[in-house]
């Protein structure tokens, strides 16, 4: 028996080694052929804030890509996904070519009419996770100062008209365009490999997809790495004139003059969270410039950006996460990859240095996900009412794999945004929701005073 155990151990180790080698080969193949990676090596390291605000940074379109696609299958609304024929990338490629030939015209302003569009099988829907402004893509708008917001594209059978919807205000706008051809997008939608039945439910921040049945979602694995803290010091502060000071918790703060600093994690902690701060007295930028300026700071970090996407914008905050197989990845249970915060006296950029480097071939492991309505009902029993929920989505939670120090597993789970905080369902069920509610009521009372 002892001999057999060692023999089995040998083959297990050999299989793991072969899987890693195969992953490296696949990674090289993907890097040289997959459209997602076609722009690697063209990082916008030299992008200035002025270039970002003038919309001249090419990867503006790489970061601001719709992240979810919907279409109808046999009269039923489905979330569509195909890793090979990526609908959102195909849409973005065509919308970049589009040019507005008319002014933006509001055609819908009631919730009832808005929901008619949501449930109309004549449209494909390409959706951002949060609102962006009309002026972000100025070729679709004849005004550079239009801070009206939208989060949803409706693509009809025509290539000459595009509709933009705002889930929160129930407004739909029509723009006549030229230069785009969505025929391939429609073909991708018809033939999408993943078609998950959903219905859209209005929550605080818009319509979230509620999955109608229990699903077994794939667990993915990746080899990860992290840039050294010296890499970020060099990029963000420079190589000369930098001073440092270590606090009691082991964190070191590096400073360049009085205006710029970088807080790095304790090397022994295993943490990879950084905080970059630039002090400057200024007005908080308007909505469009917050989105554009955050692109500038993302580029300054020097993170790998091929799967990094705009994810959340609340007031003065703009956040980005990595999307893998169409699903957002949360770090440290519920953190975003990058979060920029604008204030009157500083700009803060909190970020994590993780890089999802090499995908491991799928081994068949899955995670069961309940129907969304059932999850919301369970949260209600723990005190988090549906009326408290701003958004609910399926996201990836990271778990370390014991077989290799750099190997992680991405576990599908429900994430909920409530009281302006993202947490997994498991986390919310352990929280004192009454305390959150009381704090919110206190803040509202003070605002009235």
Predicted regions and their residues:
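N-terminal Lys/Arg-rich, disordered targeting/topogenic segments
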Residues: 1-8
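Preferential activation on post-signal-peptide N-terminal prodomains/segments
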Residues: 4, 25-286
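Hydrophobic membrane-insertion alpha-helices, especially the h-region
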Residues: 9-30
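Amphipathic, soluble alpha/beta structural segments
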Residues: 140-163, 378-413
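Exposed beta-strand-loop-beta-strand "reactive/processing" segments of non-cytosolic proteins
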Residues: 231-275, 304-347, 352-354, 393-422
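Short, non-transmembrane alpha-helical segments in secretory-pathway proteins
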Residues: 279-316, 362-403
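Short helix-loop boundary/capping segments
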Residues: 345-369
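Extended hydrophobic
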Residues: 361-365, 395-448
């Amino acid at each position: 028996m002892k001999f057999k155990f060692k023999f089995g151990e040998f083959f297990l180790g050999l299989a793991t080694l072969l899987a890693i080698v195969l992953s490296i080969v696949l990674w090289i193949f993907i890097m040289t052929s997959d459209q997602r990676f076609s722009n690697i090596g063209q990082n916008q390291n030299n992008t200035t804030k002025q270039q970002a605000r003038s919309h001249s940074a090419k990867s503006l379109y790489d970061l601001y890509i719709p992240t979810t696609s919907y279409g109808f299958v046999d009269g039923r609304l489905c979330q569509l996904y195909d890793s090979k024929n990526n609908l959102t990338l195909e849409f973005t490629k065509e919308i970049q070519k589009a040019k507005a030939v008319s002014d933006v015209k509001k055609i819908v302003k009631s919730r009832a009419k808005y929901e008619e569009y949501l449930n109309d099988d004549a449209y494909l829907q390409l959706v951002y996770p949060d609102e962006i402004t009309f002026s972000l893509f100025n070729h679709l708008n004849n005004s550079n100062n239009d801070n009206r917001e939208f989060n949803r594209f409706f693509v009809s059978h025509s290539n000459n008209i595009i509709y933009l919807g705002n889930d929160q205000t129930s407004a739909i706008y029509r723009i006549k365009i030229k230069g785009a051809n969505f025929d391939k997008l429609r073909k991708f939608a018809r033939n999408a490999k993943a078609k998950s039945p959903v219905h859209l439910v209005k929550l605080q921040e818009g319509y979230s997809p509620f999955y109608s049945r229990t699903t077994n979602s794939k667990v993915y694995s990746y080899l990860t790495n992290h840039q050294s803290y010296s890499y970020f010091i060099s990029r963000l502060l420079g190589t000369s004139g930098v001073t440092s000071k270590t606090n009691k918790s082991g964190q070191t703060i590096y400073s360049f003059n009085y205006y710029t600093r970088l807080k790095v994690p304790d090397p022994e902690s295993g943490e990879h969270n950084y905080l970059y701060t630039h002090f400057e007295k200024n007005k908080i930028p308007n909505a469009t410039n917050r989105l554009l300026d955050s692109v500038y700071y993302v580029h300054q970090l020097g993170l790998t950006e091929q799967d990094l996407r705009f994810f959340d914008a609340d007031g003065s905050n703009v956040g980005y996460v990595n999307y893998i197989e169409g699903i957002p990845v949360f770090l440290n249970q519920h953190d975003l990859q990058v979060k920029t915060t604008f204030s009157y006296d500083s700009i803060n950029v909190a970020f994590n240095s993780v890089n999802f480097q090499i995908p491991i071939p799928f081994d068949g492991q899955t995670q069961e996900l309940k129907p969304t309505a059932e999850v919301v009902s369970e949260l209600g029993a723990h005190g988090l009412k549906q009326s408290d929920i701003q958004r609910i989505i399926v996201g990836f939670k990271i778990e370390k794999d014991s077989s290799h120090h750099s190997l992680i597993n991405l576990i599908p789970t429900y994430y909920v945004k409530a009281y302006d905080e993202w947490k997994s369902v498991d986390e919310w069920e352990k929280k004192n929701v009454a305390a959150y509610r009381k704090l919110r009521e206190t803040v509202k009372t003070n605002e009235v005073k």
